[in-house]
Amino acid sequence: MPRIREAAQLGLVAAVLLVGSGPERVVPGATAAEVDATIQPVQTQHAITVNGKELSYTATAGAVRLRLEKSDAEASVFYVSYRKDGEDAARRPITFVFNGGPGSSAAWLHVGALGPRRLLLSDEGTIPEPPARLVDNPETWLRFTDLVFIDPVGTGFSRAIAKGEKGGDEEGKAFWGIKSDLRSLGEFIRLYLNHNGRWASPKYLAGESYGGFRAAALAELLPAKGGIELNGVVLISPVIEYTLNMGSDYLNLMPWVTFVPSYAATAFHHGKYRGAATDLKSVTEEAEAFSQSQLLLALASGGSRKSQQVAEVLAHLAAITGLDVAEVQRHRGRIPAEIFAKRLLEDRGRVVGIYDGSVSTPDPNPFSAGYPARDPSLDPLVPSVVSSFNGYVRDELEYRTDLRYDLMNPDVIQAWNWAEADLGELPGVGPRLRIGLSLNPKLKVLLAHGYFDLATPYFASKYVVARLELDEEVFPNLRLTVYPGGHMFYTRTDARQQFYRDAKALYEMSSMTPQR
């Protein structure tokens, strides 16, 4: 199924998982003895000060041992949970959080945005001089919900359990596929609710990138398969329909359309925009209208339209994206993200990030026509997240293990079973999201994106939302917001603060009690 295999080449997946991989990246399965040594949860008491008030909480770091249904595959799934002290668990919301990849641990959202302790960054999201350190997080979601951060199998400290005395990576493959991954996450959530007496709590999901894909699917699957009712879902920089993010097939024109507004936003940020709009909102709105009308028609027409008409469309595309007209004509209006990121600031000797187009650095390989192997908006963050989380989990949470914490594991994506997608097409969860919303009219959904995200562009989600054909009673329950920033827009202070307010509003609308 070649189209399914192409999904593994999607920029957001390949770039994340290959960053800093090093020569030896095999994550072996853990033996039963190793699992037994780490599965016992460790509880610690903490407090942070937010707006002059103390927020005290209990942190638990541990693992849940689970088995896939109708399978002998077992795994130890690592988690860190936070429970605000002095609250009634039956009325207190609980949120299950995971990142994406597939192959990424939850540390990104954990110490990047939602947890009570956050990686110290500048207001623009840049990293200060090492060593990395954590600070109290005034935008922690613990202010309005308890939190459970989950590392899917093969990431973080989560491991498949090896059958023999020696660990191997074969056991992990039973969990590395679209459906098996969803089943294992659903089983973890069920077991966690059992073990911690949280069935009566308002329940939420929050997932980033492929984690948004997971959360959208689970919005339909958890109630249907597990009897787990949900109050809300937050999709952070999600990929909902892969067919809108992949432009490898010239018969599929939509990816060439959905990326254009983010290209225009990035060009505007760097002073390369040559259109008529004068602010970011107007720039993107004009780009949205143009890309799904004139540009789409020009791409669809092939050679049937007069060349002058097509030339005018391509000239306008060049103007709003900041690229040379010749470059746009060379690609016939079909601009891959890597080409855009390489060419936009080429005259300055710089490249922009795919994960955040507002970030630029000197081109590390100016003599190559291709995009650098390292993303300037992602790579610098990786060592800081890894080192800060390793210190945090051991020193503050007192969780002791000799297992390596895998922030990103390329073995997962390389072995991922994309063929589990329905009908052999590219994966998509738009219909599942529609079903989840329609069958649960009280479910609230927030889609959050960054304007400068060139991996999962916001306009792809906006395009999906407009075509879900939700009932007028249900449609107000779904909200899409776009923030200044990239894929991890929450690294910027202004975006993180607004995201916190938007998420808090969703919880107040959907849970049974107002949150303080």
For each feature predicted by the language model, list its residue ranges.
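N-terminal cap/lid subdomain of alpha/beta-hydrolase-fold enzymes
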Residues: 71-176, 466
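Short alpha-helix in the alpha/beta-hydrolase fold that links the catalytic acid
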Residues: 443, 457-467
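Alpha/beta-hydrolase fold nucleophile elbow
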Residues: 198-210
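Catalytic-loop region of hydrolases
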Residues: 26-94, 106-108, 112
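Catalytic histidine-centered segment of alpha/beta-hydrolase-like enzymes
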Residues: 484-495
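A catalytic-pocket lid/entrance helix-loop region that shapes and gates access to the active site
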Residues: 116-120, 223-320
